[in-house]
Amino acid sequence: TGEEAVSEMINAMRLDRGTKVPVLHVRIRGNGECVQTFWAQGRELGCFRCLVQADHKNYREERYPVLKDQPKRRQLGCAGFTPYAVSAPMSAAALCLEVVVGWLETGRASPRFRTRSTSNANVYAVKDQDVKRLPACPACGSTDAALAAVRT
């Protein structure tokens, strides 16, 4: 959908229902400089909300920042949008297929968080990895840890 709020809602529904069905989040970052996938399944590793900080001092900052510059935005009539090249969705689809094919071949989706950038992108290198749960994550963490994070 391109809306982080929708991804967070899907994440919350997955956690609330305790489903074993995996959810694959795919996103284009910035103006298409890179694409990322995040495979969410079970509760042993981090959820989609664990991709941003949960503590009071760094609340909602990215745990794995990739963009060095703010994306350029455009306005057309009453709508705002982030322009990117036609190749960006193709890169996102290719990375999505890489994850799914790997899962079908091996039964595993590791690493669950993956990033691919264009060759000339001005981005930070982010390693492919399995994201650890944040103890204070408001979606999958413990209530005690969340309260402690707010107090510090």
What positions do the PLM features span?
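Glycine-rich phosphate/adenylate-binding loop
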Residues: T1-T152
